[in-house]
Amino acid sequence: MSRRGTAEEKIEKSDPIYRNRLVNMLVNRILKHGKKSLAYQIIYRAMKKIQQKTETNPLSVLRQAIRGVTPDIAVKARRVGGSTHQVPIEIGSTQGKALAIRWLLGASRKRPGRNMAFKFSSELVDAAKGSGDAIRKKEETHRMAEANRAFAHFR
């Protein structure tokens, strides 16, 4: 028996303008070299651009995009008897959101364009519509899991 207590689950703080945890998660993921104010600037500019493009609430577009990109299942490499198998595993909601945010930011960084706010807003709008690189990444992950369904018993 371990004598150490279990770690308390940290509650994500919400951002100052939208009072939303998702926005704060985005800011913390987009952050580079500790420049948090720049990260906030990028996110808020992207939200303004989404507001201008879609003429709807940018938070609802953000939620819809993240819901569309969040994977239900993924593959994990597992070594069994000298060979490595890709074993499909279910993903929890927190980990799924984190993956979705990572994929959205990665896809927007790869996009050609002027600045990060513009690229990120375009990626979010595309993801909310059901297209874009991040959605393709999710579908690819689901295909991989489906193809390796035979190894599900190695869990």
Curated annotation (Swiss-Prot):
Record keywords: Chloroplast, Plastid, Ribonucleoprotein, Ribosomal protein, RNA-binding, rRNA-binding
Pfam families cross-referenced by the UniProt entry: Ribosomal_S7
Gene3D superfamilies hit by this protein: Ribosomal protein S7 domain (1.10.455.10)
SUPFAM superfamilies referenced in this protein's UniProt entry, alphabetically: Ribosomal protein S7
GO terms for MF: rRNA binding; structural constituent of ribosome
PROSITE patterns: RIBOSOMAL_S7
Gene Ontology CC: chloroplast; small ribosomal subunit
GO biological process terms on file: translation
Domain of life from the UniProt record: Eukaryota
Main location: plastid
Entry's localization field: Plastid, Chloroplast
InterPro entries per UniProt: Ribosomal_uS7, Ribosomal_uS7_bac/org-type, Ribosomal_uS7_CS, Ribosomal_uS7_dom, Ribosomal_uS7_dom_sf
Function as written in the Swiss-Prot or TrEMBL entry: One of the primary rRNA binding proteins, it binds directly to 16S rRNA where it nucleates assembly of the head domain of the 30S subunit.
Record's subunit section: Part of the 30S ribosomal subunit.
Protein family (similarity comment): Belongs to the universal ribosomal protein uS7 family.
NCBIfam families per UniProt: rpsG_bact
Protein name: Small ribosomal subunit protein uS7cz/uS7cy
Native source organism of the sequence: Cucumis sativus (Cucumber)
The gene coding this protein: rps7-A
